[in-house]
Amino acid sequence: MKLNVAVQMDPIARINIKGDSTFALLLEAQKRGHGLSYYTPDKLSMIGEELVAPVQLLTVRDEPGDHFTLGEPKREALNGFDVVLLRQDPPFDLAYITSTHFLERIHPKTLVVNDPASVRNAPEKLFVMNFPQLMPPTLISRDLDEINAFRDKHGAVVMKPLHGHGGAAVFRVMPQDMNFGSLFDMFTVTFKEPWVIQQFIPEVKHGDKRIILVNGEFAGAVNRVPAADDLRSNMVRGGAAQETELTPREREICATVGPALRERGLLFVGIDVINGNLTEINVTSPTGIRAIARLGGPDVAAKVWDTIEQKRAK
């Protein structure tokens, strides 16, 4: 089966192909003979009921510095494609939300991965609250009294913006921390939505495990270990990728979360687990495929495309 695939992503010239999961998906699609077209989300337009974009034919190569070739832009209706990959990175802002409304108009006749309505309705730090039994104690609030009561009960906490990404603006706040007042003021000015306050898990120094689920099933995992002088394990923040196996607790988490993802059309998802605690469910633009492959793990990109092809064959 040969599919006509469009990818909605950030500028391809700027990606780091060594760690980029979108690039891994494109390489696998090309290997299977699928046609690739590219556009950036700012190019989407709706004219009446028609969703259009100036798409460019795309060829990819696993060669740093020379990893793609683009054809000339050609205005096309996106409902003429078999598949659209929704792969731009956050921020999960109004521009991102608007693009999900646009893409919802063509899905599922054109298969959008992930389902745009479900992406919109499942922000990673909110959707995870559907599974409190799997999480560390967590508060979502910007109310000072609520935050202080939570800190009094749980001691050291991590404080981060609700719609942040990539480890940006993540802080550990210790009990009686003299910086908390200034941090609260800074968050109040900078982030207008509520914030995430979560009990600090000291075992994060041993790693934050990124587990990939494809159509609700375990597909691969990588342990991300923070640098000695940093709290954050994100690989874009200097975290080191290590080979890993799932614990029984982590398999339980996958078995609990997986059906909810499958029901919502969330085909490619990354969940984050620290010491057996589920902390995030990433449905927008999950990463980890290339690190898992580099460490000798499963071919996650192949599993994603196997699943897409099966869905398009029905």
Swiss-Prot record:
Catalysed reactions, as listed in the record: gamma-L-glutamyl-L-cysteine + glycine + ATP = glutathione + ADP + phosphate + H(+)
Enzyme Commission code:
6.3.2.3
One Pfam match, given by its short name, reads: GSH-S_N
Molecular function per GO: ATP binding; glutathione synthase activity; metal ion binding
**Free-text comment on the cofactor:** Binds 1 Mg(2+) or Mn(2+) ion per subunit.
Pathway in which this enzyme or protein is active: Sulfur metabolism; glutathione biosynthesis; glutathione from L-cysteine and L-glutamate: step 2/2
Q: Which cofactor does it need?
A: Mg(2+); Mn(2+)
Q: Which UniProt keywords apply?
A: ATP-binding, Glutathione biosynthesis, Ligase, Magnesium, Manganese, Metal-binding, Nucleotide-binding
**ATP-grasp domain residues:** 125-309
Query: Which Cys-Cys disulphide bridges does the record give?
Result: none
Q: Where does the chain bind ATP?
A: 151-207
GO cellular component terms?
Answer: cytoplasm
Q: Where is the signal peptide?
A: none
- InterPro entries noted in UniProt: ATP-grasp (IPR011761), ATP_grasp_subdomain_1 (IPR013815), Glut_synth_pro (IPR006284), GSHS_ATP-bd (IPR004218), GSHS_N (IPR004215), PreATP-grasp_dom_sf (IPR016185)
Q: Write out the residues that bind Mg(2+).
A: 280, 282
Name the protein family: Belongs to the prokaryotic GSH synthase family.
Q: Which PANTHER family match?
A: GLUTATHIONE SYNTHETASE, RIBOSOMAL PROTEIN S6 MODIFICATION PROTEIN
Q: What is this protein called?
A: Glutathione synthetase
Recorded source organism is Bradyrhizobium diazoefficiens (strain JCM 10833 / BCRC 13528 / IAM 13628 / NBRC 14792 / USDA 110)
